[in-house]
């Protein structure tokens, strides 16, 4: 059974920082690109960041709205992906999900700024 379990959400002041984590199981994590996606009533579903494989030198890509503020990383030995979020803004409020190539999704973690 595939599982993606996010954690680390909560309430943070504008300008603050927060780190989200996602632990995967049930598939070969190191073979999958990983993404963070967020959902809010105002913007709907919004892709945030992507990290590719070791063979791609763990290349990363970001939505323009978070570039320079958010950092995605992964630890294949722990089947985990992370999202470090700095200088948070009210518009960053939403439910954050980790996903593979959008085939598998976690249950989400709520971030409120």
UniProtKB/Swiss-Prot annotation:
* Keyword Cell inner membrane carried by entry: no
| GO terms for biological process, alphabetical | immunoglobulin mediated immune response
GO MF entry, a single one:
antigen binding
InterPro entries (alphabetical):
Ig-like_dom, Ig-like_dom_sf, Ig-like_fold, Ig_sub, Ig_V-set, IgHV
**Pfam short name (any one):** V-set
* Residue span, Ig-like domain: 1-113
Q: Does the keyword Disulfide bond apply?
A: yes
Give the intrachain disulfide bonds.
Answer: 22-98
Among the entry's GO cellular component annotations, what is one? immunoglobulin complex
Cite the CDD domains for this sequence: IgV_H
Which keywords belong to this entry?
Adaptive immunity, Disulfide bond, Immunity, Immunoglobulin
Superkingdom as given in the UniProt entry: Eukaryota
Which SMART domains does the annotation name? IG, IGv
Q: What else is known?
A: This chain was isolated from a myeloma protein that binds inulin.
Q: What is this protein called?
A: Ig heavy chain V-III region A4
